[in-house]
Amino acid sequence: MSAAGAVRALRAHVETWRPYTLWYVGLVGLAGAALADGPYHPWLLLSAWAAPTAGWLGGHYLGDYFDRDLDAGSKPHRPIPSGRLAARTALWCGCACFAVLALLAVLGGWGTISAAVLAGFGIVAYSRWCKARGIAGNLVRGALGAIALLYGTLTVGLSPQRPSAVPVLLASMLAFWAHDTMSNLVGALRDMDGDRAGGYRTLPVRRGAPFAVRTVLALYAGTVTAALVAGLLADPARRAGYLATLAVVVALGGVALAPLVAHRADMPVLVALRAHAVLVVERVVLASALVGLGLGIGPQLLLAVPMVALTWWAQRMMRAGHELGTGRPALALATPRRAAMEDVS
């Protein structure tokens, strides 16, 4: 392979990874480990970050593999339909990522094995069967965030000297389940026309954009409520920093969701895309709040600031091209209708 061909292939893989979503799920796993209040061995914390990240990457590869026929019609610029990434290569890369997840899970014991199996089943079930089946698909996808949090906790182990960590963990899992279900539903709003043409019976296709937006708002209210409960149940010494971070999260959520409400009758493609772009940053801040709840404000800021910056930079550099294709953003600005561009993030 020539140097140019190698660069082209590498770019196809990087596009498949969606770097603007990559930092989130590992931070969620790390947040779960922080909430456990167990022995914070560096290797355990690294595993709590690496295993969910490997599963996330595997999910992107397999999701693009299973969606290759739909993408050929609605997103031909993406790596597999454009021929820059062979479908078989994507399948093998997805399996390799799952193998890394399996290895780390086995090293962690039966708890992490169970969580990894559940996550792997959820990833495949969503991509292969559930994505086209309304709110059930969104709920399955949303559950993966909660499982990542649980995996991180099981990596370190719950301390018997701190039984109060269990209700905090459960409330936090509910918050991430509701949040990731909500953000996935915003993704479905972006692609109503493409999903309808491809036979995907998503919630916006079945019930329309106004109903889907109301569902998004209800799920976000559930997210904030569960996250607030988690903070009120946690150690009072770190509650102030957590609640301050949660206020930032709510402010970002308002910035993301207000345009959806304003345009719910006819959703322009860029409104939905920008809403999801803000949510991608907002959820990193949300995950960092739980890191701060367990480890303190110093480690939280040390992780959150560069991850938010990397997420924002990667979106500016890559997202419009990956979602809309070269030359399509200007077209999207000029039309009120949607271009097909949903992904699993």
Residue ranges of model-derived segments:
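Multi-pass alpha-helical membrane architecture of UbiA-family
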Residues: 1-345
